[in-house]
């Protein structure tokens, strides 16, 4: 039986896809470069900015360049997000209901701690989470399971008793490698893509997601 719920942030709690695309586009314009892939934004979904920058440009960069470009992208993203912060439909109600029922709740995200705290506070959700694990807390990004294993450890719940909501393919893979259930959220990928990555099912939003029904595989 599932005992705890772990949420990715971007595309699961915050409907942030448009803001991320705008931030990457603005960064590329600033540095005068074209993306190295016909669908560049798909390369970045679920990855820390430091990992996404070399993929987006498809060339070798110094560690200093990567850090500077990643920091600038994060700043641009926060600016765009603050100007139009939107939560995924139904997720606020669902999170509050989990808190009311005292179901352990965590965030496991590739975003920085600074971004997470500012965005979740702006969305009115920060206080409803027992544990928050960000890119600042781990050595390896998704699809490595570290972020989700750390979330489970801090919740003091066995990984196999955790349910993860994820919108990215690498995030679903990370959850499954951690031994957790995974439900996809189709804000960035199709249901078929998420299920093929390892999700047991997928939802468009949280309007029809209820506890304890979702706790049962």
Feature locations, PLM:
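Conserved G/P- and acidic residue-centered "switch" motifs that form tight phosphate/ATP-binding loops
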Residues: 8, 12, 109, 167
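N-terminal helical cap/lid subdomain that shapes the substrate entry/recognition surface
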Residues: 2-92, 96-101
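Asp-based, Mg2+/Mn2+-dependent phosphohydrolase catalytic module
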Residues: 1-3, 96-99, 103, 112-217
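Short, flexible loop segments at the rims of nucleotide/cofactor-binding pockets, characterized by
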Residues: 81-86, 110, 179-180
């Amino acid at each position: 039986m599932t005992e705890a719920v772990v949420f990715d942030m971007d595309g699961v709690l915050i409907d942030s896809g448009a803001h991320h695309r705008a931030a990457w586009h603005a960064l590329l314009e600033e540095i005068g470069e074209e993306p190295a892939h016909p669908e560049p934004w798909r390369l970045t979904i679920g990855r820390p900015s430091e990992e996404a920058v070399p993929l987006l440009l498809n060339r070798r960069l110094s560690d200093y360049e990567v850090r500077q470009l990643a920091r600038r992208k994060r700043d641009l993203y926060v600016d765009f997000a603050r100007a139009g912060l939107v939560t995924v439909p139904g997720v606020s109600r669902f999170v509050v209901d989990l808190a009311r029922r005292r179901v352990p709740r965590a965030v496991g995200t590739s975003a920085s701690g600074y971004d997470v705290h500012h965005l979740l506070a702006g969305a009115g959700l920060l206080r409803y989470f027992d544990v928050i694990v960000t890119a600042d807390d781990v050595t390896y990004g998704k699809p490595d399971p570290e972020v989700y294993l750390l979330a489970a450890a801090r919740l003091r719940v066995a990984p196999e008793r955790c349910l993860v909501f994820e919108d990215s393919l690498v995030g679903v893979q990370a959850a499954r490698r951690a031994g957790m259930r995974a439900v996809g959220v189709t804000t960035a990928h199709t249901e078929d893509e998420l299920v093929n990555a390892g999700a047991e099912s997928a939802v468009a939003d949280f309007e029809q997601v209820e506890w304890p029904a979702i706790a049962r595989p």
